[in-house]
């Protein structure tokens, strides 16, 4: 049966890095809702980053299936489907390949043989969307970490993806740069109806999401809306996750509902 509301579906997926090693993922099944922000959270070793690698084809499943827009991903169709998915990694320096900003954004377009005039238009539009057009001629060493991640997002946007994966993309940023990047991602999602998948150990980032998948020891531990997940905060701490500051304060105040944003915390106080 077709699932028109999901862009990516994992069905009974298991994976191990070596044939004699233990399984990193064990019979994992979940749906990524189309056009929403899904956050996949877990501590180190939970399997969340392996999920990202499987989504973009760095690794292949050992058993089970992955579907993209109701098509089972195979060796024959993967390259075509992969063009719809962009990814932003943890370290901005490791993904900056151009000598200046605009060349970095153009790199992926060149690989797809996009005509020069269209390439110029797409680069300018993408940089404008992330507020980096005025820095188009800057070298990477002239940019902050947050600005480099904005360029990485522009490089993805220029390729017109349907899905953007953020693989710990905010973990090396200071709090202000982190929040600015999350605000940008929310804006991009809204304006382009793009599906966002954030892979993170940071539960405060999951508070931004429409849908949350909690991984633990290679299995799906919990799944639901942010409110549903954080209303059972004690279960998150039980598997070694650190609760966001507003939720910790909310618990100290003795309130029954665990989910609380920073804005909500201010109202409470």
Curated annotation (Swiss-Prot):
GO MF, one term, reads:
ATP binding
Its subunit composition reads:
Forms a stable energy-coupling factor (ECF) transporter complex composed of 2 membrane-embedded substrate-binding proteins (S component), 2 ATP-binding proteins (A component) and 2 transmembrane proteins (T component).
What protein name applies here?
Answer: Energy-coupling factor transporter ATP-binding protein EcfA1
Keyword annotations for this protein, in alphabetical order, are: ATP-binding, Cell membrane, Membrane, Nucleotide-binding, Translocase, Transport
Q: Which organism is it from?
A: Staphylococcus aureus (strain N315)
What range(s) does the ABC transporter domain occupy?
8-242
UniProt topology in membrane = Peripheral membrane protein
Primary residence: membrane
Query: What is this protein's function per UniProt?
Result: ATP-binding (A) component of a common energy-coupling factor (ECF) ABC-transporter complex. Unlike classic ABC transporters this ECF transporter provides the energy necessary to transport a number of different substrates.
Q: Where does this polypeptide localize? A: Cell membrane
Cross-referenced SMART domains, in alphabetical order?
AAA
